[in-house]
């Protein structure tokens, strides 16, 4: 299962700033117009002037936005950025090891080649941390997709060149209980997991079934919408991972999963919270 989230949830122990990125999405959102959110991790968000955010992140945001935009919405590089954010975080926390220790070459990270090539170049150009940049790129990618929510971002993670243990990412053939327990052990609720897996709304698979390479998990892979939930349950999606079917039927997850069908506001809210 290539759940493509955990953007901001692991490895954020030494955070310096928190921000959302107004104006990174070409689709207007009133929440993006109110300004930059900056705060210490331990206190509530506060609206603060853009000047309080290091300019480098605004520069990177502009550059990434342009590279993530495609015809009709977000493109394949954006999809890779969303997935990479999850893959870097899940095993040992968000520490940049995905791109600092050769993990991109593992079979479990097939399909991330383009983002694994791009982000180290951006890091070298601007002198930011790899762990921070991977999560920032994932957040920008979500916002660039039409209907994507504004994503808070926390800077200050510690980079690591120590590879994570291979084979620890959720499996595309995992049972519902197995997958739920993996996430529960990391502090996620059933609603969190149901929301996070919805990132498959922008997913296209190339390696699970090579005969159907490029098949999406719903009919609108360029849009951050809830079509994934309804189409997966109805069996009308172009392609569905076995793990997704299993999670949608899992006793704890199936309720919130069904609750996101046709409910964009509820899903966006749950995804950001998760």
Each model region followed by its residue ranges:
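Catalytic cores of secreted/periplasmic or lumenal enzymes
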Residues: 17-274
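Cleavable N-terminal signal peptides of Sec/SRP-targeted secreted and luminal proteins
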Residues: 1-18
